[in-house]
Amino acid sequence: MNGHGNSQKNTKNWLGLNWQLGSATGWGVLGLNMAAVMEKDRRFKPVSFAELGEIKAETNEAAGLVARLNKRSIETRHLIDGKKSGLLRCRFPVIHSLGNNVHFEGLPKMRDFDFAGSINFGICVFEKDYSNDFTFNNAAQFEVVFAGCKWNQAVLKKLGLPNTDLFLHGIDSSIFYPRPKREQNRFVVFAGGKLEYRKGQDIVVAAFRLFAKRHSDAVLATVWQNPWSISTDELGIAGHVDGSIDVDENGCQKIEEWAVQNGIPPSQIVDLGMVPNSMMSDVYDQASVAVFASRCEGGTNMVAMEAMASGVPCILSANTGHLDLMTEDNCFPLFKQSPLNTQKPKGISHWRESDVDELVEALERVYHDREEANARGSNGAKFMGDWTWERRTRPLIERIQQSIQDQ
């Protein structure tokens, strides 16, 4: 299908969000929070082009917003009129999610049906840099491409693209803020992010394995479940761990079993499974420290941002998108960043490997000097005070509105 569909008479002030909204993925959380700000702002009515049916409301506060989004989503399905492939050209502007596909001919997507707006904008978060003519041509199709971190924007600007802007993502300050710490007998090392080579969980396991031998009260608490397939070959490529990991009958990775196989005592590892975003604050409340040893971040690592906003002392790899989160005293940076020892550097030559010993030293520093750790955690929370979804999304709304008015 290529056209305007059956009817677009009631689409005044609509602004399409061309990806799946929800709480299960970073993109989903991003979209829901952007939509909430847009609803409050009232210049645009956000429209979710949902692929997987209705969005589910996790909290009573979100129920009204989700109901409106689902209602508009149903209306977009009427515009499609049952077609399963093709392109619907909308009479309203659309924001598109862009990832590593921005580097490939034709901007390939994982679905047969797509939407195009009267004006098109992109939010671009890529981890692999295959910069080429396709990157330029794809990005040039959009009125504005909002990069998810300064590193992403620098890559696009280096290609000579004049239409880039920055959209650093936000946090929900009504959920993620410092709370009084619970009394507990364990030193809880939290590590989050879907399990994959890029996120550096193998580095965390290697470091905690050493740390745990010195501190029997330490426990590694993980939120590492990955709903997508994992390359076990990649997990073990750096030599820190055996990458082979089993899944249970529900398709969930057996994180605890994998950690034990890689040398962590059973009493010092707990995997919390798939935790809804609205409940992550309970996890951060129990954390003594949070560790993020990513080899690359195309955005600014939403889980790290939430942990910082909650006042948790954070250890961050000093590379790519993480650099946007760092000041002199708001976290514990891992500065020893080495090129990857891999035979397949294409697209990942900018990725960096954190040093296991430096990570162990950072954990020891937090363990032995809680005063410094608490001060850095407090500074991190203050820093994230400027990163609310409202403060981050309003400039994007302004830029989009101005671009539309300039047409």
Predicted stretch roles:
Residues 285-299, 312:
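Acidic donor-binding loop of glycosyltransferase active sites
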Residues 133-134, 171-186:
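Acidic anion/phosphate-binding donor-loop and adjacent secondary structure
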Residues 277, 282-287:
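Short alpha-helical donor nucleotide-sugar binding micro-motif in glycosyltransferases
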Residues 354, 358, 368-398:
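A charged, aromatic-enriched C-terminal amphipathic alpha-helix characteristic of glycosyltransferases
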Residues 313-316, 330-333:
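Short hydrophobic beta-strand element within catalytic cores of glycosyltransferases
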Residues 16, 60-155:
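Extended catalytic core of nucleotide-activated donor transferases of GT-like folds
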Residues 232-278:
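Nucleotide-activated donor-binding/catalytic signature segment of Leloir-type glycosyltransferases, i.e.
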Residues 16, 182-199, 205-209, 220-222:
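Conserved donor-binding/catalytic core segment of Leloir-type glycosyltransferases
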